[in-house]
């Protein structure tokens, strides 16, 4: 779906863009990969109207748990986050190590392979430190030089006809404690203060300008304003009531100053209410251009019994609705840590189950706007976190429409 239906049909229609309805996107060869008629009569909506994507996890925000070989090769072994590694290596050495990583973790061949596997979307986690003048030189330590590599990835994906979501994964001060996905292993979340919001807003303005002025970003249609904030409505209240509406205002004002017409506005994405930070729409006065991100990791849902049929059944009836439109922006095939390597769940001998569970989840998430799997690749020797490895294992089909023929439910 390229443009999204208005959230309240009684109000005037003003649409931000998603691929396939009001704005078509094409590969450099002239192909529209969203304009494919599904061969399956079981589909409730045509395949061309759904996001089917992968996260570029650990490309611009490295999470050592899933990229241990790359982390070691960079000289970062034993460091918990990008901040820690840069501080340990020193700026110049770190910049070269990260440049080598950015130039190899995701390549143009990866992008082309994604399209061959029926994927039409990438979600790119980034940190605020891409805008290097936001970094406090006396107290913060992050790699420099990433923006050119982001341009390259977006250019390749645009040339391939893919839709692109850019996600502020690492916020100033860290939006979660002790989480490498924020770029730093902060003991406390420091994001929830006005001066940190101001830095994030500067990043969003800069990113918005870059997207609209750089042709390599031409297929970026969505900008997520913060990934996975604290799951505590009281602690997140200033974010909901101040940062979110300010982000909308600053992004829209930037677009207006650039002369961008409403049909070319970016979708502005927030975590949905299911995430647990509060109602993201609570203080918004203009949400026609809003989109919502749902992260669904069944492994951490204690209400689902830990057996195969319960997992299939839970996914078959999983309603991720609520805020509209929602994309399930992170999910995987991983199961609870204490059983993941037992005989009943071991990946190599249970491919039939994982294939059924993939189909059940994907079908459920396509009842919303679609899905983005975490992640495209991982260095775990475990396809449950790695889309490309799951395809190689025969768990995920290259013909994604065929998931409806599995009849997992």
Curated annotation (Swiss-Prot):
Signal peptide positions on this chain: 1-16
Keyword Glycoprotein listed: yes
GO biological process: cell wall organization; glucan catabolic process
Similarity section: Belongs to the glycosyl hydrolase 5 (cellulase A) family.
GO cellular component terms attached to this protein's record: extracellular region
Record field: catalytic activity: Random hydrolysis of (1->6)-linkages in (1->6)-beta-D-glucans
Protein name (Swiss-Prot/TrEMBL): Glucan endo-1,6-beta-glucosidase B
Active site: 228, 330
Gene Ontology MF annotations: glucan endo-1,6-beta-glucosidase activity; glucan exo-1,3-beta-glucosidase activity
Keyword Mitochondrion annotated: no
UniProt keyword annotations, A-Z: Carbohydrate metabolism, Cell wall biogenesis/degradation, Glycoprotein, Glycosidase, Hydrolase, Polysaccharide degradation, Secreted, Signal
Broad EC category: hydrolase
Functional description taken from the UniProt entry: Beta-glucanases participate in the metabolism of beta-glucan, the main structural component of the cell wall. Acts on lutean, pustulan and 1,6-oligo-beta-D-glucosides.
EC numbers: 3.2.1.75
InterPro entries, sorted: Glyco_hydro_5, Glycoside_hydrolase_SF, Glycosyl_hydrolase_5
């Amino acid at each position: 779906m390229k443009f999204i239906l208005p959230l309240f049909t009684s109000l005037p229609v003003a649409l931000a863009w998603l691929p396939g309805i009001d704005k078509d996107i094409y590969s450099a060869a002239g192909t529209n990969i969203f304009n494919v008629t599904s061969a399956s009569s079981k589909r409730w909506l045509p395949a061309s109207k759904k996001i089917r994507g992968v996260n570029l996890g650990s490309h611009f925000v490295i999470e050592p748990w899933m990229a241990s070989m790359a982390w070691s090769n960079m000289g970062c072994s034993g460091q918990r986050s990008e901040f820690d590694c840069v501080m340990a290596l020193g700026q110049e050495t770190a910049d070269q190590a990260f440049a080598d990583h950015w130039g190899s973790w995701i390549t143009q061949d990866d992008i082309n392979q994604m399209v061959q596997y029926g994927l039409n979307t990438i979600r790119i986690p980034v940190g605020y430190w891409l805008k290097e003048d936001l970094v406090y030189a006396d107290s913060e330590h992050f790699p420099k030089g990433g923006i050119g590599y982001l341009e390259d990835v977006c250019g390749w994906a645009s040339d391939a006809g893919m839709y692109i979501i850019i996600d502020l994964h690492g916020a100033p001060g860290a939006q979660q404690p002790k989480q490498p996905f924020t770029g730093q292993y902060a003991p406390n979340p420091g994001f929830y203060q006005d001066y940190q919001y101001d830095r994030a807003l500067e990043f969003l303005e800069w990113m918005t300008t870059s997207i609209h002025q750089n042709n390599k970003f031409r297929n970026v249609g969505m900008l997520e304003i913060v990934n996975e904030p604290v799951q505590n409505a009281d602690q997140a209240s200033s974010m909901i009531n101040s940062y979110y509406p300010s982000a909308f205002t600053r992004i829209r004002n930037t677009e207006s100053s650039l002369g961008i017409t409403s049909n070319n506005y970016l979708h502005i994405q927030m975590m949905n209410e299911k995430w647990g930070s509060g109602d993201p729409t609570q203080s918004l006065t203009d949400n026609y251009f809003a989109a919502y991100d749902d992260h669904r990791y069944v492994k951490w849902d204690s209400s689902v019994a830990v057996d195969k049929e319960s997992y299939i059944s839970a996914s078959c009836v999983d309603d991720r609705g609520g805020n509209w439109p929602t994309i399930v922006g992170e999910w995987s095939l991983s199961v609870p840590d204490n059983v993941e390597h037992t005989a009943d769940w071991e990946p190599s001998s249970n491919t039939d189950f994982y294939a059924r569970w993939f189909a059940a989840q994907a079908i459920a998430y396509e009842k919303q706007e679609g899905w983005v799997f975490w992640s495209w690749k991982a260095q775990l020797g475990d396809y449950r976190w790695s889309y490309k490895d799951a395809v190689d294992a025969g768990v995920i089909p290259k013909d994604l429409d065929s998931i409806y023929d599995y009849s997992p439910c």
